[in-house]
C-alpha cells in the first residue's frame, strides 16, 4: 500500500556555481522526512530502474531550460506522486538501493553523522530497553534487535511496530505515528518538534482475533498483556464495572492468559484511541473521541448542547477517504517539521443507499489514515485466505497505474491534497482524480 508522502514546500537555493536549484521538503505522515534536490531523486530513480526495470512509476522529465511557475508546480506534483507510487511495491521498499538512499538523505537533512548511539525503546508497561546501534539503523533493524532481546519469535515480529509516542505529565499518551520500516528512529526523535516524545513498541494490528496467532509465544503474550493493562489504565478500553473487577483480580493473580481472554470481551479491546478532536456530524463543531479497531471507527460525539452520541462507522461501508492540509506553511526557511496544525480527514460513508461525507479535524489525520489502511489490509488478507481468486474492492490510495508485476486487483480510494488544490462544488469539496483503479 502507498504511503503518505507529500511535498508541500519547495525552496530555491543558490548553488556553488552561482546558479539556483530547488530543494524539496518531503514529508511522511505529516512529519519532515528529508530535503532533496531533483537531481538526487533522478539518480535514485535510475538506480532503481537498473534493478526493477520499467515496472516503476514514471519519473518527472528533465528540463534543460528555465521552468515557469506552472512547470515547477507540475514537477512538484509529479515528484509527490512518484514517491507515493514507488513505495507501493514492497519489493522496492525492501531493496538495498531503496533503503540506502533514504537513509542517507534522512541523515543529511539533519546534519547527523553515522556514529554509535544508544536508543531507548519503551514497552507498554513503561520500562525501556536500551538498543545499542548506529544513528543510521532503520526502524526495521531496531525492531529486529528488540525482538531478539525480548525472545520474540522471528515470524511474529511483523505483528509489532515502533511508534513515535508523546507523553504528558498527567499520565496520558498520544500515538503520533507508526514508523515505516525505512525510517530512522534516531532522526525521527531529533526532528520531532513535539515535547516529551519517545519511541515505543506496540502491537500493529487492529483485528483482535489475530491475538490467537501470538499466544503460543511467551514474549508475544507478555507484550499483549502489557498493552492491555496500559489500555485499561489510559481508559482506551471500556470495561464494565464487573469486567474491571474481574480483570483486577486476574492481574493480581498474574494470570495473563485468562486476563487476555476476558479482555477480548471488553469494549474497544485492541483499538487505538486518538486525542480529542472535532467533527462535522451531526452538526459542525461537535467534539469527538475516536477509537479505531475491529473494522470500525467508533465515535463518541459531544454535541454543542452537551448531549453525547455514540456512532460506529463500519469499514465495509467506507467508500473512500481524503486527508487535506488546510494550513499555509510560512517561514519556509525555518524547521517546519510537522504538518499537524490544520489537518482534516473526510470519508465517504454509504448507508441505506445514501452516501454522505463525514469530516474529522485532527492533528492525527495521517495516523488515522494509517489505521484505516491497516484495517483494510487485514480484511483483504482474511478474504484472500478464504477465497484466493476473489477480486476485492477496497478503499485505499489512489492515482496509480497497474503494472504486470503487481497483479493485485483493487479499487483504491485514498488521496492527500493541499488546500490550494481543493475545488468548491455545490457547498462541498471535490478532488481531482479522487477514484482510480489498480495499484
From Swiss-Prot:
Gene Ontology molecular function: any one: phosphatidylinositol binding
Assembly description: Interacts with CCDC22, CCDC93, VPS26C and VPS35L, associates with the retriever and CCC complexes.
Keywords from the named record: Protein transport, Transport
Protein name: Sorting nexin-31
Gene this chain is encoded by: Snx31
Family affiliation: Belongs to the sorting nexin family.
Disulfide bonds: none
Database matches in Pfam families: PX, SNX17-27-31_F1_FERM, SNX17-31_F2_FERM, SNX17_FERM_C
Amino acid at each position: 500500500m502507498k504511503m503518505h508522502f507529500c511535498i508541500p514546500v519547495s525552496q530555491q537555493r543558490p548553488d556553488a556555481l552561482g546558479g539556483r536549484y530547488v530543494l524539496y521538503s518531503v514529508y511522511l505522515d505529516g512529519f519532515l522526512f528529508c530535503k532533496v534536490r531533483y537531481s538526487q531523486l533522478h539518480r535514485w530513480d535510475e538506480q532503481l530502474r537498473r534493478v526493477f526495470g520499467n515496472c516503476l512509476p514514471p519519473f518527472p522529465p528533465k528540463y534543460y531550460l528555465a521552468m515557469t511557475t506552472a512547470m515547477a508546480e507540475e514537477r512538484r506534483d509529479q515528484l509527490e506522486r512518484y514517491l507515493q507510487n514507488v513505495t507501493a511495491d514492497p519489493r522496492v521498499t525492501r531493496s538495498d538501493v531503496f533503503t540506502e538512499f533514504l537513509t542517507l538523505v534522512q541523515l543529511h537533512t539533519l546534519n547527523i553523522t553515522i556514529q554509535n548511539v544508544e536508543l531507548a525503546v519503551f514497552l507498554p508497561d513503561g520500562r525501556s530497553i536500551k538498543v545499542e546501534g548506529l544513528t543510521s539503523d532503520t526502524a526495521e533493524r531496531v525492531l529486529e534487535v528488540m525482538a531478539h532481546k525480548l525472545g520474540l519469535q522471528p515470524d511474529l515480529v511483523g505483528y509489532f511496530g515502533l511508534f513515535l509516542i508523546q507523553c504528558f505529565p498527567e499520565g496520558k499518551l498520544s500515538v503520533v505515528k507508526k514508523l515505516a520500516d525505512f525510517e530512522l528512529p534516531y532522526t525521527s526523535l531529533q526532528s520531532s518538534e513535539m515535547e516529551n516524545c519517545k519511541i515505543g513498541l506496540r502491537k500493529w494490528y487492529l483485528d483482535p482475533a489475530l491475538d490467537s496467532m501470538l499466544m503460543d509465544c511467551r514474549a508475544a503474550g507478555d507484550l499483549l498483556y502489557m498493552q492491555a493493562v496500559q489500555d485499561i489504565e489510559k481508559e482506551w478500553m471500556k470495561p464494565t464495572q464487573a469486567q474491571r473487577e474481574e480483570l483486577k483480580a486476574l492481574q493480581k493473580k498474574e494470570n495473563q492468559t485468562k486476563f487476555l481472554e476476558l479482555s477480548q470481551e471488553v469494549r474497544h479491546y485492541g483499538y487505538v484511541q486518538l486525542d480529542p478532536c472535532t467533527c462535522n456530524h451531526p452538526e459542525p463543531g461537535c467534539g469527538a473521541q475516536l477509537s479505531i479497531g475491529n473494522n470500525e471507527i467508533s465515535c463518541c460525539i459531544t454535541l454543542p448542547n452537551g448531549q453525547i452520541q455514540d456512532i460506529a462507522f463500519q469499514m465495509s461501508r467506507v467508500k473512500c477517504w481524503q486527508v487535506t492540509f488546510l494550513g499555509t506553511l510560512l517561514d519556509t526557511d525555518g524547521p517546519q517539521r510537522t504538518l499537524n496544525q490544520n489537518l482534516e480527514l473526510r470519508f465517504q460513508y454509504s448507508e441505506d443507499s445514501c452516501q454522505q461525507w463525514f469530516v474529522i479535524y485532527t492533528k492525527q489525520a495521517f495516523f488515522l489514515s494509517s489505521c484505516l489502511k491497516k484495517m483494510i489490509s487485514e480484511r483483504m488478507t482474511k478474504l484472500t485466505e478464504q477465497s484466493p481468486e476473489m477480486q476485492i474492492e477496497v478503499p485505499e490510495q489512489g492515482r496509480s497505474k497497474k503494472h504486470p508485476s503487481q497483479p493485485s486487483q483493487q479499487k483504491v480510494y485514498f488521496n492527500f491534497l493541499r488546500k490550494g488544490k481543493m475545488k468548491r462544488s455545490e457547498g462541498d469539496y471535490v478532488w481531482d482524480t479522487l477514484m482510480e483503479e489498480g495499484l
